[in-house]
Every structure is written in C-alpha cells, then in structure tokens.
Amino acid sequence: MILIVGLGNPGKQYEKTRHNIGFDVIDYMANKYNIDVNREKFKGICGEGFIENKKVILLKPLTYMNLSGESIREFVNFYKLEDDEIIVVYDDISLDIGRLRIREKGSAGGHNGIKSIIQNLGGDKFPRVKVGVGQPKDNLVNHVLGKFSKEDREHIEKVIPVVSDAIVEIVKNDAKESMNKFNGVNIE
C-alpha cells in the first residue's frame, strides 16, 4: 500500500492558495483515478483505491500545515507503512511556478509541513514531490496563503496533471525513475 499525501490547510479561505497545491493535486488524482476522498480518519480526509494496480490511500491532513505529521504518523502506524511507501506533495517557494522537483529524502528546507512530518516519523527518508509556487515579493505568509494570479492559476492547472504523472511514476517504479523523467521539466 502507498500513502499519497497532499499538504495544505483545511477551510474555504485556503482553497486554491499556493500552500494548498498538495490538496489540489490530491483532488485531481481522486477525480482521475475515481477515488472518493471523503472519509475522515486519523485527523485527515482520505480515500482508498488503485493506481497502476497498487493499492493507494489519498490523504489530505486536516491538522493545518504545521501539524501535518500528526495525521501521517497515525496512518503510518495503523497500516505499518515503510518510509518509501509514503509520497508527499507540497508547495515550494524556491522553485518557479511550473517547476517540479522530486526527491527521495531530505531536510525540511524551511517548510513547516515537512518539518512536522520528519519530527513525527523520526526521519526524512520518504519520497516527496515539490511544486514550484514562486518566490514571495515581500511577506512569506501572505505569499503562501495567497491565491495565484489568474495567469499563474492557468499555469498551475497545466502543471497539476504532470505532478500527478510524477507521483504515478513513483508508485509504478520508484522515486529515482520519477526524478529522471520529471526533475527539471518546465511546464509552459
């Protein structure tokens, strides 16, 4: 079983914000793979299904970004998942809009959601897909909690299917394969 986690914040006011790109990807994958993400469990909303003949759980933690690891830890403990059976997708301000970066492991890089996951899992050896949301011009909080401009939103809507494909490549093969195919790709 593979746990695919999209990071974000619950609530209408956070929908379609930069910080919620992980939720947007989960919604896209749920629709594409016909998985109902509507069950509340372990401080999150989730759905189970199959992608590439592998059982998956799509998860959106409802703990708010900075406590995301609490929800993930409960899933990991209940389903007895290994680190490489967790895939996390989230926003990255160090990447331009339209850029992806897949990693097998690594530090939080200043991202509080990832910091929470590392603390709760006791390690950083889980694959992750970073989605570029651009650098803030001034205030970081206003930037990540802000919505995309119309032009940037249109760009992100083209990026989300590619992010989904990168995640599926990890499910099908592994993070290295996905890195080889998708790192450095710029979606116009």
From Swiss-Prot:
Pfam family, one: Pept_tRNA_hydro
GO MF assignments: peptidyl-tRNA hydrolase activity; tRNA binding
Catalyzed reactions per annotation: an N-acyl-L-alpha-aminoacyl-tRNA + H2O = an N-acyl-L-amino acid + a tRNA + H(+)
Enzyme category, top tier: hydrolase
PROSITE patterns xrefs: PEPT_TRNA_HYDROL_1 (PS01195), PEPT_TRNA_HYDROL_2 (PS01196)
Site residues by UniProt (Discriminates between blocked and unblocked aminoacyl-tRNA): 9
Gene Ontology CC terms: cytoplasm
Main location: cytoplasm
Residues noted as binding tRNA in the record, renumbered to the chain: 14, 64, 66, 112
Site positions for Stabilizes the basic form of H active site to accept a proton: 91
Keywords recorded for this protein, A-Z: Cytoplasm, Hydrolase, RNA-binding, tRNA-binding
Keyword Lyase in record: no
Subcellular location per the Swiss-Prot or TrEMBL entry: Cytoplasm
Enzyme nomenclature, EC number: 3.1.1.29
Gene3D superfamilies referenced in this protein's UniProt entry, alphabetically: Peptidyl-tRNA hydrolase
Entry's Gene Ontology BP terms: protein quality control for misfolded or incompletely synthesized proteins; rescue of stalled ribosome
Keyword Cell division among UniProt keywords: no
Active site residues according to the UniProt entry: 19
Listed HAMAP family: Pept_tRNA_hydro_bact (MF_00083)
Role this protein plays: Hydrolyzes ribosome-free peptidyl-tRNAs (with 1 or more amino acids incorporated), which drop off the ribosome during protein synthesis, or as a result of ribosome stalling.
Quaternary context: Monomer.
Family: Belongs to the PTH family.
PANTHER family named in the record: PEPTIDYL-TRNA HYDROLASE
Name of this chain's protein: Peptidyl-tRNA hydrolase
The organism's taxonomic lineage, starting at the top: Bacteria, Bacillati, Bacillota, Clostridia, Eubacteriales
Encoding gene, per UniProt annotation: pth
